[in-house]
C-alpha cells in the first residue's frame, strides 16, 4: 500500500471514529488500534509437553520484539490441525509455524495454507509427502537429531564406564518411535554411539513406543524388561525426556534401584521435576536443546518472511548439550528457562 493511500485510510478511519464518538465504540474503532498488526500462528502437537510451552515462550518473545500478534494453538490430531488452519485463515493470519501431530499431513497442511495465502514453517517434526520424502520446499528448523542422539549414547557409555559396569551384566533399552524421522535419527544416533564406544550390539534392545507420552514409553520398556532376565544394570534412552522417563519408571517397577540404571533424555525441558527430586533416580541427565530459541527463531523467520519477503533458510539445525542434576540449574538459568 502506498503512503498516500495509507494516509487516506487512516483519515477515513479517524472520521468514522469521530462520527461514532458519542455512541458505543464501533467495531471499526476497536480494530483500529490493531490495524496493520501482522497475525501469525504457532501450532504444536503436544501443548501439554513443557518443550512446546518453552517454544511458545520463545515465540512470544519474538512477537513482543517485532510487534506481531501470536496465535498459539494445540493441535493433538489431524482434524484439529486442519480446523486450526481454517480458523487462522478466518482470523486473517499471514502464516504459521507448525509441529504437526502427524508428519504425513504435510501435503494437506501445505495445500490449505496455500489456498489461504499463508506461509508455513515446520518446527521439530519435518513434513513429509505422500511418497514418504521430506517436503523440502517447506522451511524447517529442528534438532541436529543424529548428533544429539550420539551425544546421548556417548553419555550412557561414559557414565557406565565411570560406574565400572561390565558389559556382560548390562543391557540397553532404547525406546523408539521410528515412524517419526527426527525420533528415528536420534535413536539411531544413540545406538551408533553405544556401538562406537564398544558396547555389544547384541545387548542393545529397541522398545517401540505406540504413543509418545510417559504411558507409551512405560509400556514399551515394561514389555522389554519382562523378556530380558538376568540383566543387572540398564542403560535407558529414547527420542526425548518423556521416552526416557517412562522407561526409567518401568525399571523401578521391575525392581531396579537407581544406582543400577542410567537414563539419558533429550529436550532437557521435560525432566526438571525429575532432576529436582531430593534423591537421585535412574534418570541421569538429558541432552538439552533450546526450545525457547527454536520458538523465537521460527517465529522471527516467519515474521521477516511475511513482512520483508525474506525467505527463510530451508533447513536449520540446533545443537544440544548435556545437563545433569549437578549442572542443569546453572545451564538453564543462563538460558533464561529457570
Ligand atoms: C519432537 C518431540 C519433542 C521434541 C521435539 C524437538 O517433536 O516429540 O518432544 O523433542 O521433537
Where are these regions (language model features)?
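Venus flytrap/periplasmic-binding-protein-like
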Residues: 121-131, 237-284, 322-323
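Hydrophobic alpha-helical segments within soluble ligand-binding/sensing domains
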Residues: 81, 140-169, 217-218, 267-272, ...
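Extracytoplasmic "Venus flytrap"
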Residues: 37-62, 66, 71-87, 91, ...
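Short, solvent-exposed amphipathic alpha-helices that sit
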Residues: 51-66, 148-152, 181-200, 216, ...
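Structural motif
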Residues: 70-94, 207-228, 244-246, 271
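Periplasmic-binding protein-like
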Residues: 41-43, 92-101, 119-123, 173-174, ...
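Hinge/cleft segment of the Venus flytrap/periplasmic-binding protein
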Residues: 22-23, 36, 174-177, 182, ...
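Short, low-complexity disordered leader/linker segments with a strong preference
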Residues: 1-39, 111-118
